[in-house]
Design a protein with these regions (language model features):
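Histidine-acidic metal/acid-base catalytic patches
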Residues: 87, 94-107, 113-201
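A generic secondary-structure signal marking the coil-to-beta-strand transition
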Residues: 8, 14-17, 131, 192
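Glycine-rich, proline-tolerant flexible connector loops at the mouths of alpha/beta enzymes
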Residues: 1-6
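Active-site acidic/histidine proton-transfer and metal-coordination neighborhood
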Residues: 10, 14-107, 113-116
Length: 201
């Protein structure tokens, strides 16, 4: 655990706060030791939330553990709407959140649109259960992520919904499209931020 304590010190020394600790691959074969380690690592980093892509069945198994640790887990959604065990539709997300008062949504607005769903109403109705958004521009009908402003996700409406209503939701740029030739991740993230800042101006 000393590695995580060292990382927290580096973050602290540079004025960086860890909001969410992302743990993916949480499957049915996750051991109790691995689950306890996940919580210990998140706490050592000073995170307030664990973010994870997993299934409803795993979320159900985690209920007694999350109650023991009393720590928030925010589940990330994908566009696997044909699998009722996935966090994908509004209904499946809410079904998972109802399992524990410690459960929240890490809503990926790009994937939500790829599932042919509209994020605005879901955010409006469930903002108290959403810790953070993965902000990406996706294409309908199970498409892919594309540069901001070129897909089907109503990004301008999303960020202004948060701004105008003062929702306590963190927005995180998720860079999932391929970098254009001659560009890099730093340049593309800056483009994404510029797009969002202009949208809220």
């Amino acid at each position: 655990m000393s590695h995580f304590a060292d990382m927290k010190k580096k973050f602290d020394d540079n004025g960086i706060t860890v909001f969410a600790y992302c743990v993916n691959g949480m499957g049915d074969d996750f051991t109790s030791e691995e689950i306890d380690a996940m919580f210990a690592q998140a706490k050592a980093l000073g995170a307030s939330t664990i973010s994870s892509s997993t299934t409803l069945s795993v979320a159900q198994k985690l209920v007694p553990v999350v109650e023991k640790h009393q720590f928030t887990i925010a589940f990330h959604n994908h566009d696997q709407v044909d699998d009722p065990n996935q966090f994908s539709t509004g209904e499946s997300i809410l079904k998972g959140l109802a399992m524990s008062p410690w459960y929240r949504s890490n809503l990926d607005v790009g994937h939500y649109v790829e599932s042919n769903l509209g994020p605005i109403e879901f955010i409006r109705q469930n903002h108290e259960k959403i810790t953070h958004l993965h902000v990406a521009d996706g294409q309908k009908n199970h498409g892919v992520e594309v540069p901001f402003g070129t897909g089907d996700t109503p990004l301008k409406a999303v960020v202004n919904l948060l701004k105008d209503n003062h929702y306590n939701i963190v927005g995180m740029v998720e860079l999932e499209y391929r970098n254009p030739p001659g560009s890099n991740c730093a340049i593309e993230v800056r483009k994404c931020l510029d797009y969002l800042e202009q949208a809220m101006a």
